[in-house]
From Swiss-Prot:
Name listed for the protein in its UniProt record: Phosphoenolpyruvate-protein phosphotransferase
Active site positions, chain numbering: 189, 502
Encoding gene (name): ptsI
Organism name: Haemophilus influenzae (strain ATCC 51907 / DSM 11121 / KW20 / Rd)
Note: The reaction takes place in three steps, mediated by a phosphocarrier histidine residue located on the surface of the central domain. The two first partial reactions are catalyzed at an active site located on the N-terminal domain, and the third partial reaction is catalyzed at an active site located on the C-terminal domain. For catalytic turnover, the central domain swivels from the concave surface of the N-terminal domain to that of the C-terminal domain.
GO biological process, any: phosphoenolpyruvate-dependent sugar phosphotransferase system
Top-rank taxon: Bacteria
This enzyme's EC code(s): 2.7.3.9
Length: 575
C-alpha cells in the first residue's frame, strides 16, 4: 500500500496499465556539411507531425474539457511553432553539426532545466509542459510511435511516471478508471484536468511505477489517499463497502440539489461554488450550487503567451453568466503574483512575493490590464446577474480609486452604445488583516465582502503554510482569525451589506455551524462540497449555531474551540 498527493477524489478498482516510456536513443555522432540540409528537413517534418497531433488533441480537449483547458494546447502549439525556438534549434544543429533530434533535445532540455531550478512551484510544474513538447517533437523527428491514450480498449487504472497535459486530454474516459503517478502536485495540469474530468487520481507517489506491473490488480482509494497493490480479499471487501457507502451518501445528497440552504428555524444562507473555467459550471449545477461565489479569472491569463484581449475575456465571462441562468456570479479580478506568475508579464523576483507586487497592486499599476478586464466584466453583466470583487485590498483609498475607474469605463461603454448593468455590485476580498480591521470603513464603500481565509490566516498568524517546519501553526480556527472574521461580518451587517467566504474554511464541515452562527451570509466552496454543507445547514437551528459561535469566540485556544464544536456535533447527532 502506498500513498501520495490526493489530486482528485473517488475510488476505482481495476487492472493496472503501466505506461512505459519508449526510451529515446539519440545518435550523437557528428554530421557532415552535406547532411545539414537533410537534418533541417527532418526537423521540419517532425515538427509538422507534432503540430498536427497537438491540433487533434486540442480539438478533442475542446469537446471533452472545454475551451479553457483546450487553451493549454494552444500554448503548446505556440511554443512548438515559436520562431525563436526554431532558430535556436537550427543554429545549434548547424554550428555543432548534430542531427535534428539531438539539437531539439538539447535546446528544450535547457529550458526544462531552467524552469525546474526556479524557486517557484507554478513555474516548476510548467517544466512538465516543456518536457511534454520536447518528447513529442523529438519522437516525431526520430519517427517513433507515440501512444494514443484515447485508444485504450480495456478498463484500466493508468500508472505512469507522469501524465502530461496532452496525454490526460486524450484519455478514453469509458475505459480509464483512475490515474496514479510518480510525480506531480495538486496544482499540476494533470491534477486540475483530473478534477475537471471527475477522474480519481493520486499523484506524487514517488515509486508507483517501480512497484506496479501491467495486469496487477489495484484499488485506487482517492478518498483516504491510498493505493492498494494486489489487495487481499478483505481489503477489497472493505473498500467495496466504502464505495457503496459513498454512493449511498451521494444519492441522498443529490436529493438536496434543488433545495435551499435554510436552517430548521428558517434562517436562509447561500451555498455557492468556486470555479476557474466555464467547464466547472457543470459541477456547480450538478451539485446544487446556488450561484458562483468566486470565479477565479486568473486561469484565463495562464498557459498562454500574451494577455487575453477584452473580447476573449468578455466571451468567457458571458458564457459563465449565461450558464448560471439568473443566479449570481461573483467575478474576482486577476489575482496574479505570489505563487502565480505569468511568463509574459515580467514580474520582478521578490524576496516576499506574497507581500509584494501582486493582484490589485499590479492592476492599479498596469491600467491597460485593469481596464480591459473591467470593460469585459461590465459588458458581460448585461447577460445575467453579475458582481465584481477585488483581491488583496488593504485600504479605503484603493477601493475609491477602483470605483472611479469603473465609473469612467461605464461612461466609455455608454458612449459606445454598449449595454451593461449600471447597478453591478462591487465588493472586496477581505484577506489581509488591514482590510479586516478596517472593515467598518470599507463597508461604507462597497456592496459586499468575501473573506479569503487562506491568505487571511497566513497573514494574521505570520505563517507560510507551504513551509513544512511551521505549517502546523497554520490554523484558520485560531481565535485571532475567527475574531477578525466576526468583525468583518458584523461591520457589513451594520451597513446593511452581506458577507461571503470563499476560502477553504467555507467548505470545512467542522467550521460550518460556527460560521453560520457568526452570521456568514454566503458559503463558497469546491462544487463537490456543496451538498454536504447544505445538508448540515438544513439540519440545525440557527439560534443553536449562534450560541455555539458566541461561546467559541470566548475561548482562548483553537483546541478548546475544536472541542466545543465536537461536543455540539455529537449532542445534535450531526457527526
Amino acid at each position: 500500500m502506498i500513498s501520495g498527493i490526493l489530486a482528485s477524489p473517488g475510488i476505482a478498482f481495476g487492472k493496472a496499465l503501466v505506461l512505459k516510456e519508449e526510451k529515446i536513443v539519440l545518435d550523437t555522432q557528428k554530421i557532415t556539411d552535406d547532411q545539414i540540409d537533410a537534418e533541417v528537413a527532418r526537423f521540419y517534418e517532425g515538427r509538422n507531425a507534432a503540430v498536427e497531433q497537438l491540433n487533434s488533441i486540442r480539438e478533442r480537449a475542446l469537446i471533452s474539457l472545454g475551451e479553457e483547458k483546450a487553451a493549454i494546447f494552444e500554448g503548446h502549439l505556440m511554443i512548438l511553432e515559436d520562431e525563436e525556438l526554431e532558430e535556436e534549434i537550427l543554429d545549434y544543429l548547424r554550428s555543432n553539426k548534430v542531427n535534428a533530434g539531438v539539437a531539439a533535445s538539447k535546446i528544450l532540455d535547457q529550458q526544462v532545466t531552467m524552469l525546474s531550478e526556479i524557486d517557484d512551484e507554478y513555474l516548476k510544474e510548467r517544466a512538465g509542459d516543456i518536457r511534454d513538447i520536447a518528447n513529442r517533437l523529438v519522437k516525431n523527428i526520430l519517427g517513433m510511435y507515440i501512444v494514443d491514450l484515447g485508444d485504450i480498449q480495456e478498463e484500466s487504472i493508468l500508472v505512469a511516471y507522469d501524465l502530461t497535459p496532452s496525454e490526460t486530454a486524450q484519455l478514453n474516459l469509458e475505459k480509464v478508471l483512475g490515474v496514479v503517478t510518480d510525480i506531480g502536485g495538486r496544482t499540476s495540469h494533470t491534477s486540475i484536468m483530473a478534477r475537471s474530468l471527475e477522474l480519481p487520481a493520486i499523484v506524487g507517489t514517488n515509486k508507483v511505477t517501480k512497484l506496479v506491473n501491467t495486469g496487477d490488480y489495484l484499488i485506487l482509494d482517492a478518498i483516504n489517499n491510498q493505493v492498494y497493490i494486489n489487495p487481499t480479499a478483505s481489503q477489497i471487501d472493505e473498500l467495496k463497502a466504502l464505495e457503496a457507502k459513498i454512493s449511498e451518501e451521494k444519492a441522498e445528497l443529490a436529493k438536496l440539489k434543488d433545495l435551499p440552504a435554510i436552517t430548521l428555524d428558517g434562517h436562509k444562507v447561500d451555498v455557492v461554488a468556486n470555479i476557474g473555467t466555464i467547464r466547472d459550471c457543470d459541477g456547480a449545477e450538478r451539485n446544487g450550487a446556488e450561484g458562483i461565489g468566486l470565479y477565479r479569472t486568473e486561469f484565463l491569463f495562464m498557459d498562454r503567451e500574451q494577455l487575453p484581449t477584452e473580447e476573449e475575456q468578455f466571451i468567457a465571462y458571458k458564457q459563465v453568466v449565461e450558464a448560471m441562468n439568473g443566479r449570481l456570479t461573483v467575478i474576482r479580478t486577476m489575482d496574479i503574483g505570489g505563487d502565480k506568475e505569468l511568463s509574459y508579464l515580467d514580474l520582478p523576483k521578490e524576496m516576499n512575493p506574497f507581500l509584494g507586487w501582486r493582484a490589485i497592486r499590479i492592476a492599479l499599476d498596469r491600467r491597460e490590464i485593469l481596464n480591459a478586464q473591467l470593460r469585459a466584466v461590465l459588458r458581460a453583466s448585461a447577460f445575467g446577474k453579475l458582481a465584481v470583487m477585488f483581491p488583496m485590498i488593504i485600504s479605503v483609498e484603493e477601493i475609491r480609486e477602483l470605483k472611479a475607474v469603473i465609473e469612467t469605463l461605464k461612461a466609455e461603454l455608454r458612449e459606445e452604445g454598449r449595454l451593461f448593468d449600471n447597478n453591478i455590485q462591487v465588493g472586496v476580498m477581505v484577506e489581509t488583516p488591514s482590510a479586516a480591521v478596517n472593515a467598518k470603513f470599507l463597508a461604507k464603500e462597497v456592496d459586499f465582502f468575501s473573506i479569503g481565509t487562506n491568505d487571511l490566516t497566513q497573514y494574521t498568524l505570520a505563517v507560510d503554510r507551504g513551509n513544512e517546519f511551521i505549517s502546523h501553526l497554520y490554523n484558520p480556527m485560531h481565535p485571532s482569525v475567527l475574531g477578525l472574521i466576526k468583525q468583518v461580518i458584523d461591520a457589513s451587517h451594520a451597513e446593511g451589506k452581506w458577507t461571503g467566504m470563499c476560502g477553504e474554511l467555507a467548505g470545512d464541515e467542522r467550521a460550518t455551524l460556527l460560521l453560520l452562527g457568526m452570521g456568514l451570509d454566503e458559503f463558497s466552496m469546491s462544487a463537490i462540497s456543496v451538498p454536504r454543507i447544505k445538508k448540515l445547514i438544513r439540519n440545525v437551528n440557527f439560534q443553536d449555531a449562534k450560541v455555539l459561535a458566541d461561546t467559541a469566540l470566548q475561548k482562548p485556544t483553537a483546541a478548546e474551540i475544536d472541542q466545543l464544536i465536537e461536543e455540539f456535533l455529537l449532542e445534535n447527532s450531526l457527526n
